[in-house]
Amino acid sequence: MSILVYTESANNEFKKSALEALSYARALGDKMNESITCLAINCNDFSQLKQHGADKIIDVNNSSLEKFTSKHYSEVITEIVKTENIKIIILNSSANSKYLGAYLSGKLE
């Protein structure tokens, strides 16, 4: 079982709120004795994710994901949830992540 953190980025840099979500996930994972898996979309430098506690990083580079759409992003996350035995998903607090969270809750129920 694992905790998945969607680490939102812009211009190949992770948003501050995504790193805060990852730090929260690390603390939760430590309490629950669970590993932390990060999803990074169209990014190249993962050093910040490792510094903030990621155990595993799933790197998805796809030109169709350069512009955020909850449909496409939720398809990626849903596949990861199935293949990685994810039990908890943590999103940061942004308009895109809030929209994505609502979309995911319908897909994963």
Regions found by a protein language model. Give the residues of each.
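N-terminal glycine-rich FAD/FM-binding segment characteristic of electron-transfer flavoproteins
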Residues: 1-109
